[in-house]
Amino acid sequence: MLVSYNWLQDFLNLDQEPHALAEKITRTGVEIADVKHPEEGLKKLVVGKVIDCEGVEGTHLHLTHVDVGEDEPLQIVCGAPNVAAGELVIVALHGARIAGNEKIKKGKIRGIESYGMICGLQEIGFSDSVVPEEFADGIYVFPEDADVKPGQDVYEALGMDDYILDFDITPNRADTLGMEGAAYEVGAIVDQKPKIGDVVLKEDGPDWTSSLEANVDEKLAPKFYLRKLTGVKIQPSPLWMQRRLWNAGIRPINNVVDVTNYVMLLTGQPMHAYDAKTFETGKLEVRLANKGEKLTLLNEKEVELDPRDIIITDGEKPVMMAGVMGGLNSEITSETTDVILESAIFDPTLVRKSALRHANRTEASSRYEKGVNWDATEKAINMAALLLRNDAQATIDEGIIKATDTKREPVVVKTTVSHINDVLGSEISAEEMIKIFDRLGFVVDQDGDNIAVHVPNRRWDISIPADLVEEVGRIYGYDNLKSTQPLLAETHGGYSEKEEMMRRMKAIVEGQGLMEAISYSLTSPEKAVRYTKDPKDIVKVQMPLNSSRSVMRQNLMTGLVDAASYNFARKQTQLALFEQGRVYDHEGGTFNEHEHLAALYSGNTFAENWQHLTQKVDFYFVKGQLTNLFTAIGIDPEKVTYEAAPILGMHPTRTAAIYIDKQYVGMIGMIAHAVTLADKALRGAELYGYEINLDTIIPMLTKGMTAVPAPKFPAIERDLSLLVDKEITNQEVENVIKSNAGKYLVDLKVIDVYEGSHIAIGKKSFAYNLTFLNRKDTLTDKVVNNAMDKIIAGLENDLDIKVR
């Protein structure tokens, strides 16, 4: 919003220099992006009167003599097609500076002496977008009734002596998209009440309201007012109005269109004017467009309307895209004599989408989409009628058609003085606070510490106590708030025990050679419940971007499998990844978060070289990695058990649930073939991994670790090769071995698993290494042999297992 400093003076007695005022406004929360002074850099530009004008033979040039208030007229050669005797024009004298810092000097053109230059508006710094069309390709000519005389500076006459404050307005402060709103804002800052009066209008024509039937959908246009003016004389606007329009970045067109734009700039209420002949049908309708309907807009662009566009029709065909731009078939022309004015409020969302859809954002649409003052609708239409009576000799017919007239009651926001002070860290008294609200134009009811603030409709951004805190803070002045140190309790700093353990576990798995992955917390409903023994109620996202990111994850393994797929697609198949993060559920109607740790392996356990043959990752390798992790954090491997369990997304026979002291803490195993085969990149690759719940495990850990001295006596190792049924698991075998081995068994490892040739159908071979140790005495073969006999007998009796 380009705000004129001179126009602000109509409402306020400003004694501050414009740049200083802009700085003060910026400090209160409405940023002033720039301050421009149009005459800056220009000099020796005066009003001149063309005394005579003759064509130069054989050229497009004109030889003129121009009165510039000096003793003798100046001879100036001009090439503009619209120069003529008797015109009041802009003259750049010898030594003048015009736009682009160009210096004007006397010289010869086609051998003819020229002592200056007759200028167009663009040549003295005006943008092409604001120059009236009749002067777009020529010099500017002052209106005949302009209060100017030869020799005077042009700056004041053209509004170039003004200062233009560029309000960089955020969507919540659209109340300042009108001069009255800006005056309220600046008035509150400088502690003045702006002089803003009501419009007193006397109607002098017959009642017209029965001549037009207006059918308006209240949802599309909650307020829709119409007025009619007759006997309108179309002509250029007075120069004072044109100055204000082009300083605000709007091109003057004619007195009717200019009045609607001027009133919009003044009140913030967009308006539109129709040639009354448009509604000879006697009907006006506001509705959504029908598919296939078309409309040629005022910019001569034909658009195919969308069923979501609000349009104004004459009962049959569209004549305006509501809130955006009028139609060419209803425009004001030089032949127009009767005008219908519209002042309305349209649905902001639909207007915004229409403007974007048709790439046609206008001053009106930008205001509608941010919001307009519901109390300005009638004032705006009456003011426009009054101005047209003065500038177009119009007759104002009696009556306003209020097709819709939804009322909006002013908001009352309740809070306390102490709350505002607590938030600001201030000690502002109730009296001073009420004075601040009075400066803003808010009425306050006070009851001790409690206040109820009545907010006028022009400030629709104020609705909650926090808004009042902001208003008090910015008007009081953020610079005036005392600086205080934050009151914080002294702590020793550092991490909690849980955080320390999580960081330690992360360091351990990194030491095992795993690389950290960080995946999305959002996933699909299908993936959310995979890799979990007992899936919980999922946490749904209210407005998901797509179905693949519509719920919160219940496992980390999904992200690691996705990461593996990404790497496999790039020929990186030797993977060892881990992730430590949170998973989420909605069990019991409450939202829960849990810390998990997951790891995923593929390919070989280590790179093949001349010393070592390759070895593929398998269940037992991953289990060994997890056992090492448990041992490193102080969990006795003897307390950890693995039981076969069906888990969605995992292999049915190569997966186990993990228990510590009979409490479920996670799962381990191979990703199901169905999952990897469904992925084009993985193509059925064997992926093994584990996922454990740290929230369950960490409380089980004991503080510190007990040092165990190195054994003084030798250990004895024995290997045991068994032929077992295919359905029997390693855990079952280990349980029997441990229960029969006696107290000297200190380690039990799987050293081989085999099934294939030389093994009976339905059977498989397990080979174990058993370590026996007596820490207090030398262990004898007799004791170990006795233990082995008991183990073999137990295996035969309990599981029908034979020794190979």
UniProtKB/Swiss-Prot annotation:
Residues 711-804 form the FDX-ACB domain. It is found in: Cytoplasm. Its EC number is 6.1.1.20. It comes from the Bacteria. Transmembrane segments: none annotated. GO terms for molecular function: ATP binding; catalytic activity, acting on a protein; magnesium ion binding; phenylalanine-tRNA ligase activity; transferase activity; tRNA binding. Keywords: Aminoacyl-tRNA synthetase, ATP-binding, Cytoplasm, Ligase, Magnesium, Metal-binding, Nucleotide-binding, Protein biosynthesis, RNA-binding, tRNA-binding. Residues 408-483 form the B5 domain. Binds 2 magnesium ions per tetramer. It catalyses: tRNA(Phe) + L-phenylalanine + ATP = L-phenylalanyl-tRNA(Phe) + AMP + diphosphate + H(+). The keyword ATP-binding applies. Residues 39-155 form the tRNA-binding domain. It is an enzyme of class 6 (ligase). InterPro entries: aa-tRNA-synth_II/BPL/LPL, B3/B4_tRNA-bd, DNA-bd_dom_put_sf, Fdx_antiC-bd, Fdx_antiC-bd_sf, NA-bd_OB-fold, Phe-tRNA-ligase_IIc_bsu, Phe-tRNA-ligase_IIc_bsu_bact. Mg(2+) binds at residues 461, 467, 470-471. SMART domains: B3_4, B5, FDX-ACB. GO terms for biological process: phenylalanyl-tRNA aminoacylation. Its cofactor is Mg(2+). Belongs to the phenylalanyl-tRNA synthetase beta subunit family. Type 1 subfamily. Tetramer of two alpha and two beta subunits. This is Phenylalanine--tRNA ligase beta subunit.
